[in-house]
Structures are given as structure tokens and as C-alpha cells.
């Protein structure tokens, strides 16, 4: 299995150029997601570990009450007012978040996008997250392989305000288009990365079209959990599913044979290494002019935190797969 954390540390060592100016004081990082969501929970421990391991003053996880851009902006402004001097943010809006990032950068508070990118032009220093399009593409290819290259599939995905959702929808479509005409997407259900809408819409789909669908790909946390539970409750292993992330419901469904596999991400590594890099930026480090950035549809300053497919053969050691 790939050691993602080691890879990311090595990658940053290659692209950062120390130009120390001194006198920047103690780094206090705020890690702010777009709203409440289980994916981001790992950022809390990541920040605590970054403080301990790298000598940061703070690296605190703070969550807006709702998925609302204005609430996220108000929270960020409040945190900066409390003395936080570096911000890692999951964009509440791929374009709209740029306004506050620019204001912070102008005020000497460096920022970066974490787990999802803002669109360029931007004053964010970089975007560090899963190549979500590539992950969705690989997951769909694994599903197509499990289906023997033919069948009807459904795609359940996340919030439409999430900058990753469109990338995932396009990637699933690309993988299907490469399947030689044997695979058809019969339903895409988006904007369901919360339990109530996911439970309602996925179970309604299964009741109405469960007999017609051969495979399911989920590209957001909550739809993966709800779909895995639905297949488990049905007790029918005919439908193949590839999920995302590492919720215990999904992992148990893999062990029990109701889910084929899941695409793991690395939220802990994002928060841990992201905090480290923001400290280096505040100390005066600069990125090399020839830094080997990756490019996505949103940015040409992207670092991939990694993704890996896990199935029944290695689900018991999935923690190792995330490292």
C-alpha cells in the first residue's frame, strides 16, 4: 500500500524553497470546512498532532453551523479577530470563497484550499486535496470491472455547492463512456450529502428501480453510508457497489459482501500536512518557480493527497492504505 503521508511530506520538501525572513511569530492555523460533515472530523486530530509535532501555536478545527458561505466567512473573520494568522478552508463556494481569501492575503494572513479547490485566479497559496475527479473515475472503473463491463448503474453524489461534485459527475461519465457501450448510467442523484435527503432519495430509488440497476457508485460520504445500509438491509448481493471514504457502515458492508469496495481519501493527512506547510509559509518559505504542481479543472497549483481502492481483500488493513 502507498504511504500517502510520507509521500506528501517528500513532495512538499521538493517544492518549498526556504527564504526565511524571521520575526513572524507563532503560527495559529484555523481549519474551517464549508459546514458540518463527517469527512472533516479527522482535521481536528490532525491539527492537534501538527501542534505537537511541528511546534505550532494552534491548529484548531472550527465548523460553521450550516453550509452557508456567509456563515463560513463570518466564522473565518471571527477567528482572525481572535488571533489566528493562517487559514485552511474547504471552499463554501469555488468562486465566492475567493473574495475572503483575497482579503486575508492582503492583510498578511496566508490561506490555502483544503479538500476542495477554489477557481483561479485566486490568492490562495495552493489547493491540497484528493484529485476527486480521478478518484471518482477510478472507482467507476472498479465498478465496471466488477460488473464484467456491462450493466446499468446509478451515481449518488454530494452537495451541488461542493466544488468537487461537478468534477465527480463528469469523471463517472468519462469512465462509462470508455466502457465500450456496455454500461449505462440510468440515474444521477446529487445534493444528498446529508442523511435526511440521502435516506429519502436513495431508498425511494431502490424501491422503484432496484430491480433494474446492476451497480452503484457513490462519490460522497453520506450517500455511500446510506446506499451501503440499503443494500445490507435488502440482503441481496446482486447489485455491485463502489463507495467512498471509511465510514464503519461501508467497511462492514464490504466485509459482509454487500459492497464491492470503497475509494479511500486522506482527510487526516490534509489537515496535518496542510498545517505544517502554512507554518512554513508564515516563516518565509516560498514555492519554487518550477514547482511540479498538478493541474485540475479549477487550479494549476494542486497537490494530490492521495486515493486508493480497498475491497474485501484489504479492508481489515485500510488504515495502512491511508498512510
Name the predicted role of every residue range.
Residues 25, 72, 128-153, 167, ...:
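Hydrophobic alpha-helical segments within soluble ligand-binding/sensing domains
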Residues 25-27, 164, 175, 179-182, ...:
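Hinge/cleft segment of the Venus flytrap/periplasmic-binding protein
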Residues 95-134, 138, 145, 152, ...:
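Flexible loop/hinge segments that line or gate small-molecule binding clefts
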Residues 39-54, 135-142, 163-183, 197-201, ...:
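Short, solvent-exposed amphipathic alpha-helices that sit
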Amino acid at each position: 500500500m502507498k504511504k500517502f503521508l510520507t509521500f506528501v511530506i517528500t513532495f512538499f520538501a521538493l517544492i518549498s524553497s526556504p527564504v526565511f525572513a524571521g520575526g513572524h511569530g507563532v503560527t495559529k492555523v484555523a481549519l474551517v470546512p464549508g459546514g458540518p460533515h463527517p469527512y472533516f472530523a479527522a482535521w481536528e486530530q490532525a491539527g492537534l498532532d501538527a501542534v505537537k509535532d511541528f511546534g505550532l501555536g494552534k491548529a484548531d478545527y472550527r465548523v460553521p453551523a450550516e453550509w452557508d458561505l456567509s456563515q463560513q466567512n463570518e466564522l473565518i473573520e471571527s477567528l482572525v479577530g481572535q488571533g489566528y494568522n493562517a487559514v485552511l478552508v474547504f471552499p463554501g463556494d469555488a468562486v465566492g470563497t475567493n473574495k475572503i481569501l483575497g482579503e486575508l492575503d492582503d492583510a498578511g494572513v496566508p490561506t490555502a484550499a483544503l479538500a476542495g479547490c477554489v477557481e483561479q485566479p485566486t490568492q490562495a497559496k495552493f489547493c491540497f486535496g484528493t484529485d476527486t475527479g480521478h478518484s471518482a473515475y477510478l472507482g467507476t472503473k472498479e465498478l465496471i470491472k466488477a460488473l464484467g463491463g456491462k450493466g446499468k448503474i446509478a451515481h449518488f453524489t454530494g452537495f451541488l455547492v461542493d466544488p468537487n461534485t461537478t468534477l465527480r459527475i463528469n469523471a463517472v461519465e468519462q469512465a462509462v463512456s470508455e466502457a465500450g457501450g456496455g454500461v449505462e448510467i440510468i440515474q444521477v442523484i446529487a445534493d444528498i450529502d446529508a442523511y435526511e435527503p440521502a435516506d429519502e432519495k436513495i431508498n425511494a430509488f431502490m424501491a422503484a428501480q432496484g430491480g433494474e440497476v446492476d451497480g452503484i457508485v457513490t462519490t460522497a460520504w453520506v450517500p455511500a453510508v446510506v446506499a451501503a445500509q440499503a443494500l445490507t438491509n435488502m440482503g441481496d448481493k446482486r447489485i455491485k457497489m463502489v463507495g467512498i471514504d471509511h465510514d464503519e457502515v461501508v467497511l462492514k458492508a464490504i466485509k459482509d459482501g454487500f459492497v464491492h469496495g470503497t475509494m479511500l481519501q486522506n482527510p487526516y493527512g490534509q489537515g496535518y500536512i496542510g498545517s505544517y506547510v502554512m507554518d512554513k509559509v508564515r516563516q518565509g518559505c516560498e514555492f519554487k518557480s518550477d514547482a511540479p504542481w498538478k493541474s485540475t479543472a479549477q487550479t494549476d497549483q494542486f497537490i494530490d493527497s492521495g486515493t486508493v481502492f480497498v475491497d474485501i481483500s484489504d479492508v481489515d488493513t485500510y488504515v495502512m492504505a491511508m498512510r
